[in-house]
């Protein structure tokens, strides 16, 4: 069993992996980003930091989406959503619903996109978790979503 210092150190290393992964996304080095996020996920799993694990899994889904691997993206989103349900994190559910909505929209499946957008809005509106940590997560998701949108515009 990990002591508090080891757990804290492992969480910090996972956070640093994620920061570098986001930088890799900006540089369009998606393979490196996937590797780094998977390393961060393995570290978080070992510490039992479930909520952050689910947040990072959601981000991995975004990176897969950038790479046009919708199947892997949805696997990540659905596992993240299931975890959010278990830990009762409305803010995390809102983020995942938003990403699923965006995916469906890009596929031209507007009815599903609208449903998940409404779910995201409802979850976020009723969330009591509007903390600084949640805000930082939203900023990171927004940043990567812009990268996805920029890529789709460039491909059009």
Give short role names for the model-derived ranges:
Residues 2-3, 39-43, 79-85, 89, ...:
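Amphipathic alpha-helical segments of tetratricopeptide repeats
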Residues 8-12, 51, 91, 132:
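Residue signature of alpha-solenoid helical repeat architecture, marking inter-repeat boundaries
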Residues 15, 55, 95, 134-140:
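Residue register of alpha-helical TPR repeats
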Residues 24, 44, 64, 84, ...:
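Eukaryotic all-alpha helical interaction scaffolds
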């Amino acid at each position: 069993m990990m002591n508090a210092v080891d757990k804290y150190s492992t969480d910090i290393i996972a956070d640093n992996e994620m920061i570098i992964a986001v930088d890799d996304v900006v540089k369009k080095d998606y393979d490196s980003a996937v590797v780094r996020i998977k390393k961060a996920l393995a570290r978080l799993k070992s510490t039992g930091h479930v909520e952050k694990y689910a947040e990072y899994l959601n981000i991995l889904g975004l990176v897969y989406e950038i790479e046009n691997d919708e199947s892997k993206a949805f696997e990540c989103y659905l596992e993240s959503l299931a975890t959010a349900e278990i830990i009762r994190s409305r803010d995390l559910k809102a983020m995942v619903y938003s990403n699923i909505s965006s995916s469906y929209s890009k596929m031209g499946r507007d009815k599903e996109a609208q449903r998940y957008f409404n779910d995201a809005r409802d979850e976020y509106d009723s969330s009591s978790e509007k903390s600084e940590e949640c805000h930082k997560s939203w900023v990171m998701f927004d940043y990567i979503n812009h990268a996805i949108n920029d890529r789709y515009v460039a491909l059009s």
